[in-house]
Amino acid sequence: MSKQKIQLSDHFDYSRLIRFVLPCIGTMLFTSIYGIVDGLCVSNFVGKTAFAAVNLIMPVPMLVGTVGFMLGTGGSAIVGFTLGEGDKARADRYFSLFMSTALIAGIVLSVLGMLLLRPVALMLGAEGEMLDYALRYGRVLMLSLPTFILQNMFQSFFVTAEKPLLGFWFTVGAGCTNMVLDVLLVGILHWSVEGAAIATMLSQVVGGLLPVFYFLNRKNTSLLHLCRTQFEGGVLLKACVNGSSELMTNLSMSLVNILYNYQLLRFAGEDGVAAYGVIMYASFLFVAVFVGYAVGSAPIVSYHYGANNRKEVNNLYRKSLKLIGVVAVVMTIGSMFIIPHVARFFVGYDENLLILITRAFRLYGLSFLIMGFNVYASSFFTALGDGVTSALISFLRTLLFQVAAVLLLPLLLGIDGIWLAVTAAELAALLVSIGLFITRDQQFHYRKAE
């Protein structure tokens, strides 16, 4: 049984569900790990100022790259629904449309990003040596935006194509490329922040461009193939609306990261930005589990909803909430013990910074108890084709509540208010998610098996 191929049309018990989503979780975890290696190399081989500069400018290309998540999640829901209806040719046509759109958008945004990078860096508060490092790093990443957007998009479509493990191996290839080149270019050849950026750029070629050739091959054994397509504005608009929650999530994360850095520069200076960078790298590992599960399980929900199998949608809904609850408790407890050791890898050369990071993370890490439910709620409604509800959760959770918390809590609690802001925002979003789970069931009927 363990070697039997798992298909979207299957009934999912806990074992089958976990095995199906594990490659997607692994993909997200590995992506986080090679991002961490980036930070480790810059911090230890170039220095604290360069590390702070990279973390200051990093949200900018990440913000622009969210287009890939929007087309990936919104488009895969449409493609999965179409496959559930049994129309393979139309699913391929839609898939090809979304891929072409992602590539064109990446080229346009790359040009705009290069033109606007310096004024944006100045607006973020970069100056002197930090500004120089930020621009040198950011310019290279702006060049690689087309492949970065494709890489983000394919994360969802590999699952819909019933090839989550292949998607994982593409990510492993990209990650190994990044890590090896980080050590070579930054640690051995001393190419400074440009070396780290070039390593990231070439890894995105592996993760974003090579899958194009796989899906172009008519002999590939997945459910999806790239083919001739045509512009269908209605379908593209629906994908954008449906994926707007993921766009909002990732867009908001970048905007909020920018706001965090701005506040921390005011309250703690360069050390605050460096501390936040370490916390972000560490939290990537925990957030990756929730995001990987949400992305991995969404195509199953889309397929069964498209096939009008409400009983299986209910089964997936119930099992997912239970799994997320157990994992959230385990990860939160575990994170409190490992953070001092993680921090030492990054900034072992600065004892005061180590103390700041350890205290800050123990406040920030409380959010892991709640976060998974909100991530899943947004993804679940996207999978059902309810992009408006999904976008509402994402907008409130990742933008409105976090902006309010990071601006208001420091007035009451000082710098501790900044570290507690994400937990407060997740708690407020959880109340919204619970309310929407209850009210939207009247339309989708996922809380009771039919």
For each feature predicted by the language model, list its residue ranges:
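N-terminal transmembrane alpha-helices
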Residues: S9-V46, P59-G74, I78, L103-S110, ...
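Interfacial/gating helices of multi-pass transporter permease domains
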Residues: V42-M62, E129-Y133, V193-E194, V235-N242, ...
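Transmembrane alpha-helix boundary and packing residues in multipass membrane permease domains
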Residues: C24, M28, L40, N44, ...
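Helix-terminus/linker motif at the lipid-water interface of multi-pass membrane proteins
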Residues: I33-A52, A121-G128, L184-W191, L251-Y281, ...
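Small-residue-rich hydrophobic transmembrane alpha-helices
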Residues: F51-V111, F148-G167, A275-I339, M371-I393
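Transmembrane helical elements of multi-pass membrane transporters/channels
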Residues: R19-D38, V140, A174, S203-G207, ...
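Short runs within selected transmembrane alpha-helices of multi-pass transporters and secretion channels
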Residues: G72, V140-V159, G167-N178, A196-P211, ...
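Short alpha-helical transmembrane segments in multi-pass integral membrane proteins
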Residues: M1-V21, V79-P146, I188-S244, V301-S367, ...
